[in-house]
Regions:
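Short, low-order "capping/linker" segments at domain edges
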Residues: 119-132, 181-192, 302-312
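Acidic, low-complexity central loop/insert segments
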Residues: 19-20, 26-29, 72-182, 250
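Glycine-rich, small/acidic residue-mixed loop/short-helix segments
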Residues: 198, 203-206, 220-312
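Acidic, proline/glycine-enriched N-terminal capping motif
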Residues: 7-69, 75-81
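Short glycine-/aliphatic-rich beta-strand segments at the starts of folded cytosolic domains
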Residues: 22-41, 116-124, 227-237
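N-terminal amphipathic/hydrophobic targeting modules at extreme N-termini
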Residues: 2-6
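Short, conserved active-site entrance elements at the starts or edges of catalytic domains
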Residues: 169, 175-201, 238
Length: 312
C-alpha cells in the first residue's frame, strides 16, 4: 500500500470531530486476479458492492454458520496499488490468514497479515478527508463515522488533516456502545455466535441474495424462519457499570450475559422471549446486582421484546 493514498470522502463540517487509533484492530490484505471472487465465495457480504469508496461489513463463518471473524472490507484503487483490505480484530488476523490460505487452493491470490505495518483510525462526529491512508465510511450504522487504514505513526497527522481531535480509544468505545454496535470477543463469543445473534443481519453484514458462502444454509434458514432467539441488544443502567460476563437475571431466571458497558449504556446478549416475559410480568433485569433496561436502537428491524412485529 502506498504511504499516502489519494482517496477521500466528501468534505463536510468537522466541528467537534474526534479520532482515535484502535489498537485492537489489524489489517489483512488479499490481492491478485481472483481476490474478489475468492473472498466473495467465503464471506457473508456481497463483495461485488465493494468499491474504492464503499466498504462492506462481513464475516467468515464456520460450516455450522458461526462467526470465526468479522471484518470491514475496503478496496484500494488500481492506481494506488489495488487489493482488498480487511479491517479485522488484530488478535484474530493470523487465524484469518491461516483460514483464507486453507481455502485458497488454486486461486490467484496473495494473502498477507499487515497488522505490524498498518492500523485503523476511527473518526466520528464529522466528515473530512486525508491523504495519509485509505479512508472509508464505516458501513455498519449511521453515526459510526469514518475509518482510516494507515501506518499508526501517521495517526496524529491524519487526525489533523481530518480536522479532528485525536483522543484515546476509550472515547471510541463510549461512542460505539452508545450506538449499540456489538464488538466481538466482548459482546459475543467468536466461533459460538451466529450472525443474527451479533446483529450482523441488522448492520448490513449479511447479503442474503448473493451466491453461496460458508455457513449460508444455516444462516439463511435462521433468517427465513425468524428463529434467532438470542441477540446482542443495547441496555441502559443508572448505577455502577455491570462487569462484562456477569449473568443477566430476571428474578431467578437467567435471560442473558452482560457485555460492554460505558457511560450509562451497555450491550448484553439476551434471550428475547425471556426478556419479553420479564417485561410483561414487570420483573426487573439485573446484571451483577445492577438494574438494566433494554433500549431499542434506531437500526433494529427485528421484533423488540414486547412488540408484535419487526419495524417496517
Amino acid at each position: 500500500m502506498p504511504q499516502r493514498l489519494r482517496f477521500s470522502v466528501i468534505s463536510g463540517k468537522t466541528i467537534g470531530m474526534k479520532a482515535a487509533l484502535l489498537p485492537d484492530r489489524g489489517v489483512v490484505k488479499v490481492a491478485g486476479d481472483d481476490a474478489r471472487k475468492f473472498l466473495n465465495g467465503l464471506l457473508t457480504a456481497d463483495l461485488g458492492r465493494v468499491t474504492p469508496g464503499s466498504a462492506r461489513f462481513a464475516a467468515l463463518l464456520t460450516p455450522q454458520g458461526k462467526i470465526i471473524v468479522d471484518c470491514i472490507v475496503a478496496e484500494v484503487a488500481p492506481e494506488d496499488g489495488a487489493g482488498l483490505f480487511l479491517d479485522c480484530p488484530r488478535a484474530l488476523a493470523p487465524n484469518l490468514v491461516e483460514r483464507l490460505n486453507f481455502y485458497k487452493l488454486r486461486a490467484k491470490v496473495v494473502i498477507e497479515d499487515l497488522s505490524e505495518m498498518l492500523g485503523v483510525l476511527a473518526a466520528w462526529d464529522g466528515q473530512g478527508s486525508t491523504d495519509y491512508g485509505l479512508v472509508y465510511e464505516d458501513p455498519r450504522a449511521a453515526g459510526l463515522g469514518l475509518r482510516v487504514m494507515l501506518p499508526p505513526h501517521l495517526a496524529d497527522k491524519a487526525a489533523a488533516e481530518l480536522g479532528a481531535e485525536l483522543v484515546e480509544a476509550s472515547a471510541y468505545e463510549v461512542h460505539r456502545v452508545a450506538l449499540g454496535i456489538p464488538r466481538g470477543g466482548l459482546d459475543f463469543v467468536y466461533s459460538d455466535a451466529f450472525p443474527h445473534e451479533a446483529d450482523m443481519d441488522q448492520l448490513g453484514g449479511v447479503d442474503f441474495d448473493k451466491g453461496c458462502f460458508i455457513g449460508q444454509e444455516v444462516v439463511s434458514r435462521m433468517e427465513h424462519r425468524g428463529s434467532a432467539r438470542n441477540r446482542v441488544v443495547p441496555v441502559a443502567y443508572d448505577a455502577f457499570a455491570p462487569e462484562a460476563g456477569v449473568p443477566v437475571m430476571a428474578g431467578e431466571r437467567q435471560v442473558g450475559t452482560m457485555g460492554s458497558a460505558a457511560a450509562g449504556r451497555g450491550l448484553a446478549m439476551l434471550r428475547l422471549d425471556r426478556v419479553a416475559d420479564a417485561l410483561a410480568a414487570d420483573v426487573a433485569l439485573m446484571a451483577g446486582g445492577v438494574p438494566i433496561r433494554p433500549v431499542k436502537p434506531g437500526w433494529a428491524r427485528f421484533p423488540w421484546p414486547g412488540e408484535t412485529k419487526a419495524a417496517e
